[in-house]
Amino acid sequence: MILAIDIGNTTVALGGIRDGRVCFVAHMDTVRTRTAAEYRAEMEKVFSHRRHPEKPIRFEGAVLTSVVPQITGALAECARHYTCLLYTSDAAD
């Protein structure tokens, strides 16, 4: 599954994509002062509702888009926590 993160001015959309199909979509509030650890805790809440004990969510890679540069780095760090492969522009590295 690919983790898709779309950072907007009011919400951060998270999606799981497998075999070209959207498996789930969830939203979190965009908070410019939130740290990577705080965003990761919010993401854990989202993923815990979609996790099955015998079949955990595993991400093979991630893609991140953002119009909020203040938090792009924090969410890129979160994406790297869940997968070692992150597709983004050089601005987030």
Identify what each model region corresponds to.
Residues 1, 59-62:
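Short active-site oxyanion
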Residues 2-42:
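Short glycine-rich, Thr/Ser-proximal phosphate-binding strand/loop in the N-terminal lobe
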Residues 13, 73-74:
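Phosphate- and divalent-cation-binding pockets in alpha/beta enzyme and binding domains
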Residues 43-60:
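Phosphate/pyrophosphate-binding loops at sites that engage ATP/ADP/AMP, CoA/4′-phosphopantetheine
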Residues 65-72:
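Glycine-rich phosphate-binding loops at beta-strand->alpha-helix junctions
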Residues 80:
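Nucleotide and nucleotide-moiety/phosphate-recognizing core
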Residues 83-85:
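A short helix->loop->beta-strand "cap" motif at the edges of active sites that frequently abuts
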Residues 87-93:
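Conserved small/polar residues in nucleotide/adenosyl-binding loops
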